[in-house]
C-alpha cells in the first residue's frame, strides 16, 4: 500500500514537472539602461556620486525666513574627487553655475518656478569651506583645496537665504559645477 501511494506521488510530481517543462517561454520588453560618464585628462576624476547629487535642505518655517538676509541652518554636502595625482596638480577649486535670484544677490540661486506652489522671496545659497557665499557665474571659484594622492573631498554647505518675507511652497534649485586644477 505504501509503495503504491509512493508511486502515485512520484508519477504525479513527474507529470507536473514535465508540464512545466513544456510551458511556452515568453519575452517582454524591459526598459532602457542609460550609461553616462566622461573620460577626462585631469588631475582627478569627479566621483560618480558627486556628479548628480541631491542636497536635502528639508523643511524650514517661514518664521525663520521672515526678513531679507535671514537664512536657514546650513546643510553640508561634498564633492568627491577620485584617483587624484599630485604630480599633475596640487590644488582644486570649484565654481557653480546657476540662475542667480537677481543682480543684488549673485550668490543666491533662484528657485525653480512651478505654475503654483513655489515659495517666494527665498533662494538657495552655496557656501565654500570658509563659509563664503559663492557667485553662481561659473567663473568664480571656491577657496582652493590642497590635493592628496587618491581620494579627496571638497566640503560645501547650502542654505535657504531670504530676500524678503518668505512665503511657503516648494523651494528647489539647481546648479552645475566645474572643477579647476592647479
Swiss-Prot record:
It is found in: Fimbrium. It holds the Pfam family Fimbrial. GO terms for biological process: cell adhesion involved in single-species biofilm formation. Keywords: Disulfide bond, Fimbrium, Signal. One of its GO terms (cellular component) is pilus. It comes from the Bacteria. Its main location: other. Residues 1-23 form the signal peptide. Disulfide bonds join 44-84. Belongs to the fimbrial protein family. This is Fimbrial subunit type 1.
